UniProtKB/Swiss-Prot annotation:
Claim: Flavoprotein is one of the keywords in the record: no
Organism field: Clostridium botulinum (strain Loch Maree / Type A3)
Protein name per UniProt: Elongation factor G
GO biological process, one term: ribosome disassembly
One Pfam family cited in the UniProt record for this chain: EFG_IV
NCBIfam families: EF-G (TIGR00484), PRK12740.1-3 (NF009379), PRK12740.1-5 (NF009381), small_GTP (TIGR00231)
Gene name of this polypeptide: fusA
């Protein structure tokens, strides 16, 4: 089966994404079971799920890295990426979405849309990924299908169109109404393989009729022929509905909603049918866009195995047996093992050792990967996440991925002197795999610092150091990644002159510095050759290097723009080095006049608490300098939304547990940087000295 060639139209590259614990990995496990990839179903709470292949994942029961796997259903090849739902690992989601053609979002039927669902949805909007929704855990206490559909419309502004309705809920969830075919499926056994297709039960005919009308209206909106038939009261066939739905989904105009219980094996085969019927193939999406490396001219590549090669390395992983694996999506052309490809981002040729298709962590070697396929490459030396691999006669650079900056850091040291080098190598490998993880040395203290997206993120990094790389280490207290910025528009000079026998040094520039929205902008406004062109990049470099350490407390400076307005040079003594130093001097002089302030990460926090504890929890958030944004009731609990400075959130989980007797839970994610109050700023400066 696996060796059969499938035409591109029968490919589906999809991601499965959700909030933590919505049942995403369980759903993927069931898909693999039904498509014949696994013979025994793995359970995440038993620590045996096939897709969760790192030891930490099996222990914690959560998915950290996005495993990629290929399976087959109804004569289609489905490539699935299971992405993590925990906010600290959004980088994995971002990477996966960049290379997928469609996504299935899984919701928990008792909670509907949750904070991480919103984050993932926004990321998918960014890449215009067509989506469908599977409302899972219909068998659980408090399951509410229509409430969940409502949250899709209210919180995500999605045009959510149910294609199914559940028959019963909680313990009595026994089947699914198919609104497209206008019939019902009743489940007879626990494996979900024995099911009866029957008529819609009497007591549900009215609601089914109402929702089928809504479905027809939704497809009529995207298909004029159906609109005419609908208005004239003509019968619309199942095939016509399916075709229109497919077009609506691919155009991002309709989000179909299905339901089921992956754990109880209900609704999974219908979900697979819907993936095949409504999700796009590589041929249905726009040709991939990129730029010509030398001219910067925009170009596109078609999804065609005969076209020149264009592929994107979207993830680097280290495999204990074969070393570095580069997970890659082939957009056009064909990649063959043993051949050379051109890495257009690095400007280097790379040799492809072997090509493998992945099934979670089992590998199947192949001779080639064609347009539309996902696979992993063994043997690349210089390729990192986001690099384009192409044909050196037809170079192209595909749009890269943008990753958020880390917001939390901790100091780390090996327990033994001998472990220092080993730790350095291990940290470099981990940083190569994960663009949101950074490691650097604090120049003042000489300590090694690791920085990431949250406490869990860094915990798992430390865990991997111990397990995979056998490095025992001590970890300091988490520190907030503060930044600095400027509030005034100022002009400043930087002049570096040195005469000490032999050739001197001369660099001189005038800059204007001002606040801006972006991280950093450099604008060369020199006219009349006051500074020769070849020295301009050196000034820019000098400013960027100096901005890594601000004047308030030595934190990186962001949200500022520099305009280079004037300067002078010396025919003999001027050099790149002299202008680089002049640039950094001008930056420091400008900072001292520009009313610099300290910024701190502000986190978007969502706390779910039983009503009786609400007063206590809100009081506690206020005492942490939090700003309450709103509250929403949800099935016997309240959802409190607030912005709270990260520095006030350390150890919050313990406080919340004691204030709610273990019944409250929360999620938080980085939202923006904001100014630190004067009293806190003085405290931070005091601690840095």
């Amino acid at each position: 089966m696996a060796n059969k060639e499938y035409p591109l139209a029968k490919f589906r590259n999809i991601g499965i994404m959700a909030h933590i614990d919505a049942g995403k990995t369980t759903a993927t496990e069931r898909i693999l079971f039904y498509t014949g990839k696994t013979h025994k179903i793995g359970e995440t709470h038993e620590g045996g799920a096939t897709m969760d292949w790192m030891e930490q994942e099996q222990e914690r029961g959560i998915t950290i890295t996005s495993a990629a796997t290929t399976c087959f259903w109804k004569d289609h090849q489905v490539n699935i990426i299971d992405t993590p739902g925990h906010v600290d690992f959004t980088v994995e989601v971002e990477r996966s979405l960049r290379v997928l053609d469609g996504a299935v979002t899984i919701l928990d039927a008792k909670s509907g849309v949750e904070p991480q669902t919103e984050t993932v949805w926004r990321q998918a909007d960014n890449y215009k990924v067509p989506r469908m929704v599977f409302i899972n855990k219909m068998d659980k206490l408090g399951a509410d299908f229509l409430m969940s559909v409502g949250t899709l419309r209210e919180r995500l502004h999605a045009n959510a169109v149910p294609l199914q309705l559940p028959i019963g809920a909680e313990d009595s969830f026994s089947g699914i109404i198919d609104l497209v075919k206008n019939d019902a499926v009743i489940y007879k056994d626990d494996l979900g393989t024995v099911m009866d297709e029957t008529e819609i039960p009497e007591d549900m005919k009215e609601i089914a009729e109402e929702y089928r009308t809504m479905l027809l209206e939704a497809v009529a909106e995207v298909d004029e022929d159906i609109m005419m038939k609908y208005l004239e009261g003509e019968e619309i066939s199942v095939e016509e509905i399916k075709t229109a739905l497919r077009h609506g989904v691919i155009a991002n105009k309709i989000v179909p909603v299905l339901c089921g219980s992956a754990y109880k094996n209900k609704g999974v085969q219908l979900l697979l049918d819907a993936i095949v019927e409504f999700m796009p193939s590589p041929l249905d999406i726009e040709d991939v866009k990129g730029t010509e490396p030398t001219t910067g001219e925009e170009m596109t590549r078609p999804a065609d195995a005969k076209a020149p090669l264009a592929a994107l390395a979207f993830k680097i992983a280290t495999d204990p047996f074969i070393g570095k694996l580069a997970f890659t999506r082939i957009y056009s052309g064909t990649m063959k093992s043993g051949t050379y490809v051109f890495n257009s981002n690095k400007g280097k040729r790379e040799r492809i050792g072997r090509l493998v298709k992945m099934h979670a962590n089992h590998r199947e070697e192949v001779d080639e990967l064609k347009a539309g396929e996902l696979g992993a490459i063994v043997g690349l030396k210089d390729t990192t996440t986001g690099d384009t691999l192409c044909d050196d006669a037809n170079p192209i650079i595909l749009e890269n991925m943008e990753f958020p900056e880390p917001v939390i850091d901790v100091s780390i040291e090996p327990k033994t002197k001998a472990g220092q080098e080993k730790m350095g190598i291990a940290l470099a490998k981990l940083a190569e795999e994960d663009p949101t993880f950074r490691t650097y040395t604090n120049q003042e203290t000489g300590q090694t610092i690791i920085a990431g997206m949250g406490e869990l993120h860094l915990e798992i990094i430390v865990d991997r150091l111990i397990r995979e790389f056998k490095v025992e280490c001590n970890v300091g207290q988490p520190q907030v990644a503060y930044k600095e910025t400027v509030r005034k528009h100022v002009k400043a000079e930087g002049k570096f002159v040195r005469q000490s026998g032999g050739r001197g040094q001369y660099g001189h520039c005038w800059i204007e510095m001002m606040p801006t929205e972006g991280e950093y902008e450099f604008d060369n406004a020199i006219v009349g050759g006051a500074i020769p062109k070849e020295y301009i990049p050196a000034i820019d470099n000098g400013i960027q290097e100096a901005s890594q350490s601000g004047i308030i407390a030595g934190y990186p400076v962001i949200n500022f723009k520099v305009k280079l307005v004037d300067g002078s040079y010396h025919d003999v003594d001027s050099s790149e080095m002299a202008f680089k130093i002049a640039g950094s001097m001008a930056f420091k002089n400008a900072m001292s006049k520009a009313d610099a302030v300290l910024l701190e990460p502000s986190m978007k926090v969502e706390v779910v608490v039983p009503e009786e504890y609400m007063g206590d929890v809100i009081g506690d958030i206020n005492s942490r300098r939090g700003r309450i944004e709103g509250m929403t009731p949800r099935a016997g609990a309240e959802v409190i939304r607030a912005f709270v400075p990260l520095s006030e959130m350390f150890g919050y989980a313990t406080t919340l547990r004691s204030k709610t007797q273990g019944r409250g839970n929360y999620v938080m994610q980085f939202d923006h940087y904001e100014e630190v109050p004067k009293s806190i700023q003085d405290k931070v400066i005091g601690e840095r000295k």
